[in-house]
Amino acid sequence: EFRRVLFRSQHSCNDFFYEVGYRLGLNNVGDSKLDSDTSDGKSTQNYYSSERGIAKLQKYAEEFGLGDTSGMEIPESAPQISDDNSVLSAIGQGTNNYTTSQLARYITAVANEGTVYNLSLLDKVTSPKGKTIKDYTPEVKNKVTDVSASTWQAVHEGMRAVVTSEDKDIFTKLNSSGIALSGKTGTAQQSQTHPDHGLFVGFAPSDSPQIAFAIRIANGYSSTFAAEVGNDVMEYYYKVTPENELITGSASDIGTGSNGGD
């Protein structure tokens, strides 16, 4: 089961996560039989309920901080945890709606295995002479305690495999530099008449995270483009590529992007 989850996470297998959303809606999770007879002759119905599945998805979304704004010191749109159709919601559709900063806080919690922080735009305030007036120490909002060690391992290994296998051509230079990046691509559908938003979230180093990020290209068609930006950010952050080579004043020619890619 561990390898199955890892593989599906790496390859963005919607069918697998549709099944997860469906099973969460069963009154006996993991048993897909609709009816069974008990020893006393009474029938127990194991039926699917979207409301039941949604309640479970909402529980974990709340734990990961997706029910609140991120804590930044600027106005921020309120998030929306999906309240419709657990099957679609399990792959991020439904009525899910989050700002990029809210996704950044979420992926930070994934990176550190469950500590949810309130974000801040500030590190510290100093006087003209350099004396610290106020230190913005990260504030812990809550901790996710009901995720198993094996689940964290599967998620982390799946995200690492995205960078080293699934989308390795994007991260060739970063991978060869010895910097271990973990990430996940995705597309967010706004409507049938708008191109999808391209997204990429990630953290590094994979085994001892120090930085986490979320990138969204509004109506950017493909997550490939967001992954390209993420790669450039990490190459700059870790000084893999000089700034003047990354900032060219023109858009990169990305030949691998496709409309609606995950």
Where are these regions (language model features)?
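Short amphipathic alpha-helical face segments that pack within enzyme cores
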Residues: T99-R105, F225-D232
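Ligand-site clamp/hinge motif
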Residues: I217-G220
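Short, gly/Ser/Thr-rich active-site loops of penicillin-recognizing serine hydrolases
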Residues: T132-V140, N231-D262
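Membrane-interface anchoring segments and C-terminal beta-barrel signals
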Residues: G198-A204, I211, V229, V233-P242
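Beta-lactam-recognizing serine transpeptidase/beta-lactamase-like catalytic domain environment
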Residues: E1-I215, G260-D262
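A short, polar/proline- and glycine-enriched secondary-structure boundary/capping micro-motif
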Residues: V144-T145, S222-A227
